[in-house]
């Protein structure tokens, strides 16, 4: 359970204390994070590395907020619990309560640029403005700034995102003779950045690897990692 530090052209994977020889390597990190955090094989095409470094991380510039309540009062008051806002700080809000209303929660997303000492007050004021006084007094207000997370925020967080790079054809073609696979949600052609995109990428990758296994029984001479 260690972060990968280096992957060689021969598909030897180095962590802090160990090394593994693999038949296949799957990069499940967002491409920009992989390029930033891992010394990748030197033989990778320069264009692929450039595209990977510029591909946005879906949550890399986001703040997630969850407001918890004793009951989903907005339902009994005739509100859907869903809202969009250009004023903010939350650009979108959704009802995250269970089917029976427990736990009773609203959640939303804001841009990381909104993070400052007074963001909690700003959020409470927005909830009051949109759903009434009870919304502005949650039992608990949870705020997660993903832009400060090492394995979520890429170095390019904050610049104009190039969403057109999601699902780029380079990601769908395994490199190093079909043995190095890009498999994060950002590599999907549909629903990139979402769970559905991650499932698409996983299906594409597993099909590529299992197809190779059908014609080869080779196992790793060092560790059995495939």
What is the role of each PLM region?
Residues 15-79:
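Central helical "cap/lid" subdomain
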Residues 6, 36, 190:
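Active-site environment of divalent metal-dependent phosphoester hydrolases
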Residues 1-12:
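A conserved short coil-to-beta-strand element within the FAD-binding core of flavoproteins
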Residues 5, 32-33, 148:
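Residue-level marker for beta-strand->alpha-helix junctions and adjacent short loops that shape enzyme
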Residues 10-12, 61, 77-226:
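Conserved flavin/dinucleotide-binding core of flavoenzymes
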